[in-house]
Amino acid sequence: MNKLRNSLIIPIFFGLINAQSSVQGTVTDQNGDPLAGANVVVNGTSVGAASDSEGLYQIAIPTGTVEGQTVTLDVSYIGFKSQSASVDIPLSGSVTQNFSLEVDAIGLQAISVTALGFEANRDKQGSTSSSINSGDMNRSGESLMANSLAGKASNVIVNPSAGDPGASTSIKIRGANTISGANQPLIVVDGMPINNSTTYGGGNNITGGRTGGSTQQSRINDINANDIASVEVLKGASAAALWGSKAANGVIVIKTKDGSSSGKMKMTYKRTESFDQIHEQIPMQDTYGQGRDGSFRAGIHESWGDKISERTGGADVVDTSRPYFVSGEGENSFTQYTIVEKNSKDTFVQDNFDAVFQTGRFAQDDFQVSGGDATKTYLFSYGRLRQNGIVRNSFYDRDNFRLNTKFKLSDKITMTSKAGYTYSNANRIQQSSNTAGLLIGLLRTSPDFDNSHYKGTYVSGGVEYRGRHRSYRKYLGQTLNPTYNNPLWTINEQKSTTGVNRLIMSNEMNYKLREGTDIVARAGIDTYTDNRDWFFPVGSAGSRVNGVFAQDVITNKETNYDLIGRHNLKFSDDLSMVATLGYNWNDRGYSRTSTRIDSFLVNTSKQTVNVNTGARFSTADNARIFIRSTRTYGVLSIDALDQIFLNLSGALEDHSSISKSYFYPAMDVAVQLTNYVPAPFSFLKARFAYGQVGVRPSAHRFQTLAESGFSYSSYSDPLSISDWGGGYRLDDDQGNKDIKPEVKTETEFGLDFRMFDDRFA
């Protein structure tokens, strides 16, 4: 799809500085965010200043130096490209010169984030990771968080599952990593592991499952990309091993934005608009009409009839005495009689296509307020996304609220709280190889059949059959089942809606026990409820011909607790060590309740029915899963001679789906050889890493559970437990008490280098 993007960023600053005989201005990044600590210097002199936390700088010009002259201002900031500008210095008064710096991709890579959320120097690590800054994500113009990661890091494959707005996205790091489980990486937001599943549930199975139903959403897309400060992709097993059986597919560590400690309030408003268009249309033939063997035949599935160009033209010959189809009123009225001879040369390939597809559009508004001082900071944001898909009547709406606070209670205690609430709702279209889906009916429609007037009344022998579904297979609506849906019925009459309420919250207390020793306590929760409705009115194709209404209520809740101790030891100028010891407790609960009713007696568009009005009663099922895990983990980081860096780590994990504990070790070593290489090399590092990570078995696989609704015979004399009042027995699928996690062992080594003063890497 082609995308046209238009962004408007309006920063509003308070407390701007006024100065005389000076140069003043702001230093920001390309998104308009302030850069604190940037150095601004008058070229060739020692006169300069540093920008404050709001990006403001002010240089007082010494009397009798450069007044009335044109000078060059040089600005530099770590991680950004240096910039210069010519400025005319007035004889008196002030002049303003603002700078917008571009990201220096190589410079930013110096800082990375570890699996536990602590910052580290990438040049001192032997494991592999990639950093993605918020500016790169926002410039992608994508409406979904997952899609904005595409092309931002090597060996990270991002594939949207469909063109529906809000549709799920597959993220794979270094390809497939497991034969038994999902290949999605673990997502950690502000120290809290969150759910990123794409759940299809019972209702979607009713509508055809993954290949024939409607697509669902990746839960990572509940996050507003504009709230993110940085993303770290941990690719290797050695970098991710501390997460144990969750980390076989890598880890994506997300950090959201913090408030400002400048003492001033900052308000920012940003609006982004995007337009989506079909890039290329599937070529469809319009030479031959409906029929076979060179002859027109109405209502059959083939389009190898007569040549349309060789018809006589004009109106078709019809029989008005036979059954017919009628729809609309007044100027919009339409009547289709039984066709006796096909004369019309009209084709409708493009009209049928345009009736289904449109130019998609999304608009996102983001409002942010931040501020604080040396003892407290705050950030509040609101994001509003409205997206209409390229398929008519498909949409995705999302509202995000975020409140991040940080309080320094004393010299020893700091409290941080970050909370994000999301509400989203969407309507998605039935897809794939599905008789009630969109494309199978659209692509098989004969070129000389007009899909408009898809719903009306079939009249036969003076009897009216209202609400009939007209398609190219049943052009009079003569039967209740149209064989394949008319695509306009699919997008206008059927519904597949979802509404999600989600809360992600993490709290952290950092206690400085003494110089060099910190204790960090974290507690977080990720919980959501997903309410889904599927509605197929009477006359939908296939097994839904008598009408189906299905509902899913899916809830997921995860709580996570960490207690971490870190101690820094310095034995000499050439040898130091950081020891980290932690304990993690994690609970995950999932439940799904699915209900269905079908075979309506009355053809109605209302999505509420009485269970007694159907030929069959409503059916219901539910599923519940509870998983608990605990991990004890440790990291020992050794720095020798400021050239050799060794990290040893391990995690001992107990899991409710496994009967015994498992240990996941890891190590990495980095040796800097910069002092031993000639120009033009400015940096050289040899690295080696080894690690193990796992994939846990599904819940309860090591147990033999009870089952109900079983039969003891499948022959002509079945003995069913339901005939005897119900009951339970041990499942005939026996549990395996010796089941083990799937373990991935990974070894990697390589050379990292930079050249020409870090301009090339």
Feature annotation, model-predicted:
Residues V27-Q30, T128-G151, N159-G163, I171-T178, ...:
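Short, polar/charged loop or turn motifs at beta-strand boundaries
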Residues T28-D33, A38-N43, T72-K81, P90-N138, ...:
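Short, acidic, small-residue-rich periplasmic hinge/interaction motif at the N-terminus
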Residues N43, V47-L56, S112-S140, G166-S170, ...:
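N-terminal periplasmic "start-of-domain" segments of outer-membrane beta-barrel proteins
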Residues S46-V47, D52-A110, G244-K246, T256-D258:
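Periplasmic N-terminal soluble interaction domains immediately after the signal peptide in Gram-negative
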Residues A60, A146-G202, A229-S230, A240-G259:
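Extracytoplasmic beta-strand/coil segments of soluble accessory domains associated
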Residues G135, T199-G201, T207-G208, T215-D258, ...:
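Outer-membrane beta-barrel proteins
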Residues K152, D164-T169, I179-P185, I194-I220, ...:
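Residues embedded in well-ordered regular secondary structure
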Residues Q184, R398, N404-I413, K418-Y423, ...:
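Extracellular/periplasmic, surface-exposed regions of secreted and cell-surface proteins
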